């Protein structure tokens, strides 16, 4: 829950994004006896779209604005607080009215412990700052097996996660107009996976695998390597089984060039676009584009 610890009046959107035609809900927080009336003015650029006055009782109160037509509409909101007819404070906020993916303001989550499953305060805080797409960082089981085999699990760095928590955070994002993307490196694998698929790996020198922090083994993303299809299938599993809206396909910034298992040079700048295109094609469902 968002708490106004300073006991100062505050105004903020309940959602990071509102769909066209959806009523806009705002949260007004005021200390007890601070105000008895609020005057709301909604603007788009210099055009006034809506004005209203309503009583204030103190504490947290939701203000429901009407539907506003059109897509890609930035709504500026001013709230003037009055007590016995005297102006006490003027507050400002904004609301984004747009279709999913029209504009992106990116946030992230990284805590998915079982004890956090019922706490959506982090997501509520991001809505306050108009975040509309959230990356779930380090949520997965393994980089080569993203979906965990059990409800509670440890990731490759030993962090304990809960799949129930991940799913509830996704639901919390959706309830606040935010999409969710699953962090997933495009070419990282665990040592056991690499040992079983050495011919899928990338190498600094013949026989010398590329490894990041002695943990993540680089794999060959070329279309001709089975890793290409393997990681795309992992992405499909993530969306189908966990409920994410898309994938954050991460790279580590290097290497630019490496060797495949046969000692042949691989130019990643040529291979990454193809991996992205193939992933988008596999994850597309009807007219729904992955995020």
List PLM regions with ranges.
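Short, compositionally biased P/S/T/A/G/V-rich stretches that sit at domain boundaries
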Residues: 1-20
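Aromatic/hydrophobic beta-strand junction motif of beta-rich domains
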Residues: 24-32
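Extended acidic/polar, glycine-enriched regions
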Residues: 49-102
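An acidic-aromatic substrate-binding cleft motif
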Residues: 89-142
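Active-site-adjacent "subsite" loops/lids of carbohydrate-active enzymes
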Residues: 99-102, 112-116, 182-242
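Hydrophobic faces of well-ordered beta-strands that scaffold small-molecule active sites
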Residues: 105-108, 134-136, 180-182, 247-249, ...
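Aromatic-lined carbohydrate-binding/catalytic grooves of carbohydrate-active enzymes
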Residues: 122-167, 187-214, 222-223, 256-257, ...
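Active-site neighborhood of glycoside hydrolase catalytic domains
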Residues: 223-291
